[in-house]
UniProtKB/Swiss-Prot annotation:
Predominantly expressed in liver. Low in brain, testis and colon. Not detectable in pancreas and skeletal muscle. The gene is PDIA3. Part of the major histocompatibility complex class I (MHC I) peptide loading complex composed of TAP1, TAP2, B2M, MHC heavy chain, TAPBP, PDIA3, and CALR. Interacts with ERP27 and CANX. Interacts with SERPINA2 and with SERPINA1. Interacts with ATP2A2. It comes from Papio hamadryas (Hamadryas baboon). Protein disulfide isomerase that catalyzes the formation, isomerization, and reduction or oxidation of disulfide bonds in client proteins and functions as a protein folding chaperone. Core component of the major histocompatibility complex class I (MHC I) peptide loading complex where it functions as an essential folding chaperone for TAPBP. Through TAPBP, assists the dynamic assembly of the MHC I complex with high affinity antigens in the endoplasmic reticulum. Therefore, plays a crucial role in the presentation of antigens to cytotoxic T cells in adaptive immunity. This is Protein disulfide-isomerase A3.
Length: 39
């Protein structure tokens, strides 16, 4: 599978408008291993 860099400009066309399933991993470079994401 290809790895894509998603941005605000291409998110809709690459993810939302494809009509197929996929997996998106969100990454925050300033987050530590102890950070717990909130809803």
């Amino acid at each position: 599978s290809d790895v894509l860099e998603l941005t605000d400009d291409n998110f809709e066309s690459r993810v939302s408008d494809t009509g197929s399933a996929g997996l998106v991993e969100f990454f925050a470079p300033d987050a530590t291993a102890n950070d717990v994401p909130s809803p």
